Amino acid sequence: MAENAPLLLSVIELLGYPNLRPLYERLGYRVATEFAVRKAISLMRKEKPAVIVADFYFQPDFRDRVSNLESLLATAQANKAVKVLVLFESSHEHALERLRSRFRIDAALTLPVRENELEAVLTDWR
């Protein structure tokens, strides 16, 4: 992949879907994958991704937040050009809506991911 290709940051904490890297690369993205939000934030401070694709999980026992993504989304807000795509379980849509009321999320797709839907979103953003 060309070094000047736009960076897509894939944040995978749940591993609940197939490897999407080949799709991202076919669409012309340079891909960085992190398996922890804190490592993704560290990478975002070094490089500015064009797109962030992150999985969302809701845990009712979180006292001070809705999900795993608050810190990541707060960091992403500083880069107005970055597009944020969240992958989520349909049963957690209510929690995702709470998160959307506080942070910009450009698109959200339910799991299991349908590659044609993901491809359509990412193609539109290129």
Model-derived segments and spans:
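Non-catalytic signal-transmission and effector/linker regions of two-component phosphorelay proteins
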Residues: 1-23, 38, 50, 74-81, ...
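Short beta-strand/turn micro-motifs composed of small residues
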Residues: 10-12, 86-89
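Short helix-loop-beta junction
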Residues: 22-30
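Output/docking surface of receiver
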Residues: 29, 33, 87-126
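Acidic, metal-coordinating helix/loop segments flanking the phosphotransfer/catalytic sites
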Residues: 35-51, 57-61
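Residue preferences within the helical output face of two-component receiver
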Residues: 40, 66, 98-100
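Conserved phosphotransfer microenvironments
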Residues: 51-79, 89, 95
